[in-house]
Amino acid sequence: MAASTSAQNAMTSSPYSMFGLGEMASGLYGQNTSMAGVTVGMREGMLMNIENPAGLTALDSCKLFAEASAFVKNERYRSDGSSSNAFTGNFSAFSLGGRIMRRWYMSAGVTPYSFVGYYFKSSQELEGSPGTFVTSTFSGTGGLSKAFLSQGFLLTKHLSVGMNLNFIFGNMTQNEIQSAMTVSREMSGRSFYADFGLQYHRPIARETFLTVGAIYGYKQRISLKNTVTVTGSSTEPPYNQKRVTQYLPQYIGIGSSLAHKKWTYALDYLFRQYGVLNSGDSRVKFRDSHELRLGVCYFPNGFSSS
């Protein structure tokens, strides 16, 4: 089998985004991205840490923060001797945050949750007909977005907790063309869910601060309205609509950071239960992921750690 791919989406060009809910967004922006994605134990006076909302309690209480993010990435894929390159980029997130009351901090915004964006062709020889090939074309666009309301509470001088209230929504379109037949699948879904964070933070020496944190997000069911339209076939019904059940994966993370003067060092461990996702193809299975992240930051003017 031979295949070729090319980008048709500004958010991703990955053929893997045709499975499940698409290619999952990292959820990391700004300083978190530049430090290899560490978030669990991060808290700074100018950092809106929505991955661990307990970190919001470190925000400068005299300021209102606004953050907009964009990204660019270069991807290369190979399949049976052929390869493709894609350079993509787009606006990715927007958020606002600051202190509401003495011990209460809040942030709100919109970020991507998953991306669907692919276009490729596959040619396969017909059994019993040497030299005769059937070409199938696959394409997809769309994805899910996340609107969030994050809240952080400073329970004591050294202990903070936080919670993200999230609304997942979006549409995905997938098309498969083979000879004269076209199968179009349109999926739309929405779901509410919450995730939680905890941080213990204290100075351990002069100009040296230690933070230990944890985050947790539970497995959440999401119902997708799945509409399938078939054209060019006399044997299949032209239209079918049904509900498909999918899941937002459970995850748990622990991490810590050490801030000393202008330097910050951080380490995270994250477990994500991707095995609960349904790929939509019996040949494709998702596996749980384990991530270990290590980040170092040098800030010339220094952050006001707390």
Tell what function each PLM region has.
Residues 27, 38, 43, 53, ...:
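Surface-exposed loop/turn and secondary-structure junction residues enriched for glycine/proline
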Residues 14-39, 57-74:
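Transmembrane beta-strand segments of Gram-negative outer membrane beta-barrel proteins
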Residues 3-7:
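Sec/Tat signal peptide C-region and signal peptidase I cleavage site
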Residues 2, 36-47, 143, 155:
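Short, charged, low-hydrophobicity "junction" segments
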Residues 8-34, 81, 95-306:
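Outer-membrane beta-barrel porins/channels
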Residues 42-121:
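Outer-membrane beta-barrel translocator/receptor signature
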